[in-house]
Amino acid sequence: MVLILVGMFGWAVYDLTDNEETDRSDFETINESEVETGQRENESEVSEQEQDKGNIGIQVGNEAPNFSLETLSGEKVQLADYRGERVMLNFWATWCPPCRAEMPDMQKFHEQTDIKILAVNLTESEAARQDVHDFVEEYGLTFPILMDENTNVATEYAIRPIPTTYMIDSNGIIQQKSFGPMNYEQMVQALNVME
C-alpha cells in the first residue's frame, strides 16, 4: 500500500512538472458526486500563527502570488488591485461540466455579498475565445472574467483539476483552497471565516 502511494505521489510530481503544451485533456474535472462522497480536498481557516505574510505561495496561509491578466472586455487586472478586499479566485473553462454547474451560484454569491470574484478562464483549453463570450452571456455573469491565454497563471497556481477556487482574505492571504465545484452555501461559509 505504501509503495503504491509513493508511486502515485512520484507520478503526480512528475506530471505537475511536465511542461508540454496545455490542452483540454491536461485539466481534470471534479463533479458533484465526487464532492458528495468526500473526495473533495478542502483546506479552510488558518490561524494567525500559521500565516506568514512574507511567504508568497499557493498553500493555505501563504500570500497569494500576484498576476496580471486581461479581462474578456480587454481591461488589465492585477490580483494586487484587490488588496483590502476579500477575493474568490476561481479557475474554470466553458467545456467543464462542474464549472458550468457552479456558475449560477457564483453569480448569486457575487450579487448578494461584498466578495470580489475573479474568474480565470483557461483560455488555451477553449475551442475559441467566442465560446467564453457566449458562455458569459448565457449565464448572465457580471463579475470579471480573466483570460489566461497561455495558462501561465493556472501553471503558477498549479491548477489541476478544475474548477479550483482560492479564497483570499483582505490581506492577500489564502484562507481556503477548494477542488471541485462549490455551491452557494459553501461559498458563504468560506466568506464568513475571512477578514
Task: Identify what each model region corresponds to.
Residues I56-G61, N66-V87:
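A short beta-strand-turn-helix
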Residues R83, V87-K108:
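Conserved redox-active cysteine motifs that mediate thiol-disulfide chemistry
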Residues G84-R86, T113-K116, T142-F143:
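Loop/turn elements at helix/coil->beta-strand transitions in domains of secreted/extracellular proteins
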Residues D134-T142, M147-E195:
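Thiol/disulfide oxidoreductase modules built on the thioredoxin-like
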Residues M88-N90, A119-N121, M167:
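Hydrophobic beta-strand core positions in alpha/beta domains
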Residues R100-Y139, E149-E156:
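Structural microenvironment flanking redox-active thiols in thiol-disulfide oxidoreductases
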Residues M1-E63:
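N-terminal targeting signals for export/organelle localization
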